[in-house]
């Protein structure tokens, strides 16, 4: 009987121990997922992510900058605005939005600018606007531009009054209402226009706003992915132009690939943004020149006979030649192998230089 009691007690203790052990669960063991074995030489297919493809829906390449822009803008005719370039008129307004800027010498050692805008919207002030010279008419014409100016030299009057170029004159005729004077400045350095006035003038005169389907691209352009590095060119990090009054120069910034413009000893800025003017391409176009009057007469630039020059981009420069078939055609620029030059997308500054002064420009 005693033996049976001990057996029962022992069984009770064991049962208690087992129940106590069941009160605390053991953690589930971690199971590693091993890949299925493969035969030697068998490839394992893995899912790769394709790089995102940039789309340009609703956009087109600008015929004047080579950049992607709104497709409705890419088919518009540009406007060309004559802009004064003397110290008293600084800062100029709107130059930072231009697609192409021409700088030409005029009388007395000064230069005058012509800014070409395909997208001329959003500018509350443009200029100041000054008078036309005959050769500027032909530079504007090759862009099929609507030309805004404030008067003209006597030699330009006949062509401006003809049907050769659509133009709006802020001094004579009915065009004055599309310009305004800033009374805080003295005339003639105080005439300006705006985007709205430009658009109103074009509408009032009934000028077409669309480029012809046959116009094409004004220049040949590389792409952003494959820029033209001018690997055979010489270094061109500072370009100094021999214009007596403004004494302008450009300095290259290798970080953004732009040439920053200086004149009158300081950065040249756009009064709309207070940002320094910077461009991607510089073309120096050397031309024959004459004086139409004796003494300090009216300068005339030969825009058609062809000549030499320089093409500058991405910190390099090469020699070029240029030609133009007619008064209405585009100027073409060629490298020393006879190939048309390829610009990089962005703004272009064209320097018109008299042949007699071409060797006084410096490129370093």
Identify the residue ranges that each predicted region occupies.
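Sequence-pattern detector for short linear motifs
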Residues: 5-6, 27-29
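Bacterial signal peptide processing site
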Residues: 23-25
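A surface/extracellular/periplasmic glyco- and lipid-processing/surface-interacting theme
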Residues: 28-102, 107-364
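Bacterial N-terminal signal peptides that target proteins for export
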Residues: 1-9
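C-terminal motif of bacterial Sec signal peptides marking the signal peptidase cleavage site
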Residues: 18-21
């Amino acid at each position: 009987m005693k033996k049976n009691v001990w057996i029962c007690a022992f069984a009770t203790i064991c049962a208690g121990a087992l129940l106590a052990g069941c009160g605390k669960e053991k953690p589930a063991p971690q199971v590693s997922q091993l890949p299925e074995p493969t035969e030697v030489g068998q490839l394992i297919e893995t899912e790769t992510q394709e790089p995102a493809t940039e789309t340009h829906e609703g956009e087109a390449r600008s015929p004047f900058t080579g950049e992607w822009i709104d497709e409705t803008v890419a088919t518009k005719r540009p406007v060309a605005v004559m802009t004064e370039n003397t110290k008293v008129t600084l800062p100029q307004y709107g130059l930072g939005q231009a697609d192409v800027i021409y700088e030409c010498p005029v009388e007395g050692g000064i230069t005058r600018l012509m800014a070409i805008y395909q997208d001329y919207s959003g500018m509350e002030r443009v200029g100041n606007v000054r008078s036309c010279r005959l050769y500027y008419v032909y530079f504007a014409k090759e862009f099929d531009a609507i030309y805004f100016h404030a008067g003209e030299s006597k030699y330009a009057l006949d062509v401006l009054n003809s049907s050769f170029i659509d133009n709006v004159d802020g001094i004579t005729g009915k065009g004055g209402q599309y310009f305004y004077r800033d009374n805080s400045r003295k005339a003639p350095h105080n005439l300006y226009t705006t985007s709205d006035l430009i658009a109103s003038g074009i509408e009032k005169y009934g000028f077409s706003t669309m480029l012809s389907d046959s116009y094409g691209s004004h220049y040949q352009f590389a792409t952003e992915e494959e820029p033209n590095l001018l690997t055979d060119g010489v270094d061109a990090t500072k370009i100094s132009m021999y214009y007596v009054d403004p004494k302008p120069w450009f300095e290259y910034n290798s970080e953004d690939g732009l040439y920053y413009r200086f004149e009158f000893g300081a950065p040249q800025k756009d009064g709309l943004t207070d940002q320094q003017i910077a461009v991607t391409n510089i073309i120096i176009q050397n031309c024959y020149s004459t004086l139409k009057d004796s003494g300090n007469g009216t300068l005339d630039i030969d825009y058609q006979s062809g000549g030499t020059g320089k093409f500058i981009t991405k910190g390099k420069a090469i020699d070029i030649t240029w030609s133009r078939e007619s008064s209405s055609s585009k100027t073409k620029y060629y490298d020393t192998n006879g190939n048309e030059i390829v610009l990089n997308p962005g703004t272009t500054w064209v320097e018109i230089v008299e042949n007699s002064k071409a060797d006084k420009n410096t490129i370093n």
